[in-house]
Each structure stands twice: as structure tokens, then as C-alpha cells.
């Protein structure tokens, strides 16, 4: 029973780190939610295009974001080991990586735009998707640099800085998006392009706030910022050794999800709009839990650096209590209120009944897997913080791509219909969560030898 007893101190620390990150990620979810709501006021096609274009742009960025965001765990490990001067050096190595990543991202984005036509999307949907996608890719370098600083502040447990920067960015984004979409307050009416431009401007604004925190005098003195602006091959080697598997996992998983979404949207406008509606609510549940995931990575990394495995176990238990408690409430709401939640995004039109019927069915599936999502984020945070990124990469990627192959036969070969495809998607998430829990219960990732390899800079 002692193993399952949760210490108040650990829970308090987790919540103090997680709360600002949940607010930050929640603000991001609100931004996406309002963007798509504004699009739905124009037409279901515009809303579907914002989903397809947004997911495709994140797909292109995901490899680089996955690598750069591992700064959270690296910084936390150095912070726990009391090597504060190395924390800011992690940021410098991340910025060095950005010099190569940004041109590569622009090239990848240029060729990725053709996927919309290859997947057989309706011409009117494809045109809007490409407009939204290419503008987001143009400003994607800002997002990569912002990831370095956000991950750093999470690693040193200064998540209030992340909350302030991201929340103020969203406060700017929402009215700016409305103005640039509909052409009010002296702005031109740009439609879906206006939403993309507003996203870039607000990201740049958030980055400026991060820079102000980073170069603040007391912070510069404590973490030796002025002495950190050098190439450190040892830290860079750790960054790539542990971060690349994390980036590859994110890239291939997002690729699999993106291809599934593109195939699902090829059913037609009703199915594309229904997917957009349900994933809007998925974001509301999933994105705030990413804040919990970030906090768990930070705390586990710190206790790995301190070599304090007892406190690490407490983080695991506390994370499960928070994650499953939050997601269980959402699961009940998604079932009980599925019809009014869907109706928010459905305007009167020729496809209204079809969109309502399919979306309500899909909301039940969302309620089914929301607790599995919480499990994935808690366990994934623990394993990433402990440096078990290779296992995560192999298992997660294999399961996602196996699902994609199954979906190809369901959607394209046997033409079994959108409800069957959605059930397959839900089952895949449940199976992945079960595999993660089995790994967490094992011993291989937390042996002294494994943890020593994680901390080594050679």
C-alpha cells in the first residue's frame, strides 16, 4: 500500500508546474477552436479546410518540433543534477539545430502541398487547404524557435513564463483572426488566409515575450546565459541521441494520422465536416492534457538527474490521478451532451442532417478513447523524461502505421464506410495505451545502467 500512497508534496509540485502548462495548452486549444468556429461561419468546406491544412502543416513541422521539444527533459535532467550552466546551453544547441531545420522545413512543405490533390479531395476543399497550409509553412520557423524557449522554461519548472507568453499570444490571435477573416477594423477581408496570417503574427508576439523572460537580468546571471552562446558537442550529442527518436516518432505518427484524416475526408464533405467537428472537441480534451505531459517530463527528468527514483514513482501516481480524473469527467460530458456539442458547429444547409448524425456517432467514440489518451500522455511523459525514447519510437510508430494499413483496406479497398473506419481508429488508441502501460510496469527502462546511459554525454 505504501507504493500506491501519493505524497502531498509531489502532487503539489506537479500541479504547480502543470497548471500553467494546462492553461497554456488550453489557450492554444481555444485558439484552434475559435479559428475553426470562425471558418464554420463561412461554410463547412472552410472549416474542413482549416483542419486539413492545419494538420498537414503540423505534419511537416512535427519531426523538428519533436526533436527540439526534448529540450524539456534535457534541461530538467541538468537542473536536477545542479548543473545550471548547462541548462541554457541546451537552448543554444536547439537554436543551432534550427539553422538547419528551417530551410529543410520549407522544402518539405513545398512538396507536401500536392497531397491534397493526390488524396482526391473536392476541388473547392483543395484550393482552401493549400492556401491555409502554405501560409502556415511560410511562418513555421517562428514556431520552431519558440519551441526551444518554451521547452527550456518547462525544464527549469518556470512554466508561468510559458503560460504568460502563450496566453497573451492567443489574446492577440482571436480578435486579429476575426478581423482578418471578415475584414473589420480596417483590415482587408482575407477569409481562410487571414486566419493563417493571424496565427503567424501571434506566434511572433509570443516569441518576443519568451525572449524578454530569457534575457531578463536575474535569469541571465543565475543560468549564465551570456556564457551559453557556444557550440557544446557533448550536449548537442545528447540532444540528437535522445531527441531524434522522439522527433521521428512524432513525425511518423503525425504522418499516419494525417494520411488517415486525408483518407477519411475523401469519403465526402459530410465526413470531412464531421471529422473537423469531433476533432475540435478532441483538441479541447487532449491539448490541455499535453500540459500535464510536459510537467511530468520535467519532473521525471529532474528526479532522474537527482537519482531519486522514489520521487519519480510519486510523479507517476500523481500524473495518473490527475489525468484519469480529468478525462473521465470529459468522457461523461461527451456522451451526455454529444448532440448540443455537435450542433455548435453545424449551420443550416443541405448536409446538416448527415453531419449531425455522423458527428454524434463519432462523439461516442471520442468519449471511449479520451481516458486512453490520458494514459498515453502520462506514461509517455514518464518514459520520455527517463530517456526511453527509442522504445517509444518503435512501438508507437509500428502501431500507428499498422492502423493506417488497416484503414486503407477499410476505406479504399473494402469501402466499409466512415463508421467502421472510426471504430478502427478508436480501437488502435486503446491498444496503444495498453502497450504503454505494460512498458511502464517493466524494469528495463529504469535500471541504473539504462539511466546512466541516458545521462552520458558521449
Please give the residue ranges for each predicted region.
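Short alpha-helical transmembrane segments in multi-pass integral membrane proteins
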Residues: 1-21, 75-141, 187-244, 300-368, ...
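Short runs within selected transmembrane alpha-helices of multi-pass transporters and secretion channels
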Residues: 68, 72, 136-154, 162-170, ...
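Interfacial/gating helices of multi-pass transporter permease domains
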Residues: 39-58, 124-131, 192-193, 234-242, ...
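N-terminal transmembrane alpha-helices
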Residues: 6-37, 41-42, 55-74, 99-106, ...
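Helix-terminus/linker motif at the lipid-water interface of multi-pass membrane proteins
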Residues: 30-48, 116-123, 179-190, 251-278, ...
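Small-residue-rich hydrophobic transmembrane alpha-helices
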Residues: 47-110, 143-157, 161-162, 275-336, ...
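Transmembrane helical elements of multi-pass membrane transporters/channels
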Residues: 16-35, 135, 169, 202-206, ...
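Alpha-helical transmembrane segments and their lipid-water interface positions
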Residues: 28, 32-35, 39, 61-68, ...
Amino acid at each position: 500500500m505504501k507504493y500506491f500512497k501519493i505524497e502531498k508534496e509531489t502532487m503539489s509540485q506537479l500541479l504547480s508546474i502543470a497548471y500553467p502548462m494546462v492553461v497554456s495548452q488550453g489557450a492554444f486549444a481555444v485558439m484552434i477552436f475559435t479559428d475553426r468556429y470562425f471558418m464554420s461561419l463561412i461554410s463547412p468546406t472552410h472549416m474542413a479546410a482549416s483542419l486539413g491544412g492545419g494538420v498537414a502543416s503540423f505534419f511537416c513541422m512535427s519531426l523538428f518540433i519533436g526533436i527540439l521539444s526534448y529540450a524539456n527533459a534535457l534541461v530538467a535532467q541538468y537542473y536536477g543534477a545542479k548543473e545550471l550552466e548547462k541548462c541554457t546551453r541546451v537552448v543554444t544547441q536547439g537554436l543551432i539545430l534550427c539553422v538547419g531545420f528551417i530551410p529543410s522545413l520549407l522544402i518539405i512543405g513545398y512538396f507536401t502541398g500536392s497531397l491534397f490533390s493526390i488524396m482526391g479531395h473536392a476541388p473547392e476543399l483543395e484550393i482552401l487547404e493549400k492556401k491555409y497550409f502554405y501560409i502556415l509553412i511560410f511562418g513555421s520557423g517562428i514556431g520552431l524557435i519558440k519551441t526551444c524557449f518554451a521547452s527550456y522554461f518547462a525544464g527549469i519548472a518556470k512554466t508561468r513564463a510559458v503560460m504568460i507568453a502563450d496566453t497573451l499570444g492567443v489574446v492577440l490571435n482571436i480578435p486579429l483572426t476575426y478581423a482578418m477573416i471578415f475584414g473589420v477594423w480596417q483590415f482587408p477581408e482575407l477569409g481562410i488566409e487571414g486566419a493563417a496570417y493571424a496565427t503567424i503574427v501571434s506566434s511572433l508576439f509570443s516569441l518576443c515575450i519568451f525572449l524578454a523572460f530569457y534575457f531578463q537580468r536575474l535569469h541571465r546571471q543565475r543560468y549564465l546565459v551570456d556564457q551559453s552562446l557556444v557550440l557544446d558537442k557533448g550536449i548537442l550529442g545528447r540532444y540528437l541521441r535522445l531527441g531524434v527518436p522522439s522527433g521521428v516518432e512524432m513525425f511518423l505518427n503525425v504522418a499516419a494520422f494525417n494520411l488517415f484524416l486525408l483518407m477519411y475526408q475523401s469519403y465526402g464533405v459530410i465526413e470531412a465536416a464531421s471529422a473537423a467537428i469531433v476533432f475540435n472537441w478532441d483538441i479541447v480534451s487532449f491539448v490541455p492534457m499535453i500540459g500535464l505531459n510536459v510537467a511530468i517530463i520535467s519532473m521525471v527528468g529532474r528526479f532522474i538527474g537527482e537519482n531519486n527514483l522514489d520521487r519519480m514513482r510519486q510523479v507517476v501516481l500523481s500524473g495518473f490521478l490527475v489525468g484519469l480524473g480529468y478525462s473521465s469527467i470529459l468522457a461523461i460530458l461527451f456522451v451526455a451532451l454529444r448532440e448540443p456539442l455537435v450542433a455548435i458547429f453545424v449551420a443550416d444547409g443541405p448536409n446538416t442532417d448527415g453531419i449531425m448524425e455522423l458527428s454524434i456517432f463519432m462523439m461516442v467514440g471520442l468519449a471511449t478513447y479520451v481516458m486512453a489518451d490520458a494514459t498515453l500522455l502520462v506514461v509517455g511523459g514518464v518514459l520520455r523524461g527517463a530517456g526511453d525514447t527509442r522504445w517509444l519510437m518503435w512501438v508507437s510508430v509500428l502501431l500507428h502505421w499498422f492502423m493506417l494499413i488497416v484503414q486503407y483496406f477499410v476505406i479504399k479497398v473494402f469501402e466499409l464506410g466512415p463508421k467502421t473506419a472510426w471504430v478502427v481508429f478508436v480501437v488502435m488508441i486503446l491498444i496503444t495505451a495498453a502497450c504503454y502501460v505494460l512498458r511502464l510496469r517493466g524494469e528495463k527502462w529504469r535500471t541504473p545502467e539504462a539511466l546512466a546511459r541516458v545521462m552520458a554525454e558521449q
